[in-house]
Amino acid sequence: MGKEKRQKLIFKEAVEATTDVKEGYCEGIKAFGEYKSKIKVPEPSKIDGSLDIDVTTAKLYPDDSRWDYALCYDSEVFYIEVHSAITSEVSKMIKKPQWLKSWLEKKAPKINKLTTKTKQPYYWVQSSKCDIPRHMPQYKIAVQNKILPMREWDYSKILKKEK
């Protein structure tokens, strides 16, 4: 079995071994549904799969600030939240990674093991335009929490920022 095929199996197996989301694995970026256009990668064959965490955990945690998606690309898992990018949503976006980190640690350790260690793992992708003016305190809060919104999740741009 080739390395590429094995890596895809590892992410799929991690999802299937996680009781909360065991039926949620999707090939490619299918989990993103209407937001597929927000995901850009240089080599689509390196997409190991995706997971809609929000939908698959909604009944289990209806009142929690659930995270939207997990994407495994090139054997690393990234977490992407497609959400309104307005000042009133910044506080919600601060809570969401906290929920995700706790959920990964307690309920999804196999997925957590695949989380990228070499890059920022959490990304806020704006669902439409961004309206968080730089002079507003919410902008500073988003910067401090390393969760500024972006138009799209573009792996090539992320690589450039990390270098």
PLM feature spans:
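Short, flexible loop/turn motifs enriched in small residues
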Residues: 62-66
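Acidic-basic catalytic patches of nuclease active cores, encompassing PD-(D/E)XK
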Residues: 1-61
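Mg2+/Mn2+-dependent nuclease catalytic core
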Residues: 86-103
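Conserved catalytic cores of phosphodiester-cleaving nucleases, focusing on short active-site segments
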Residues: 69-71, 75-86
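Short acidic, S/G/P-rich loop/turn micro-motifs used as interaction or catalytic elements
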Residues: 60-61, 85-89, 129-133
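Arginine/glycine-rich "motif VI" loop of SF2 helicases in the C-terminal RecA-like domain
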Residues: 102-116
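Domain-level recognition of nuclease-like catalytic cores that cleave nucleotide substrates
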Residues: 4-12, 112-163
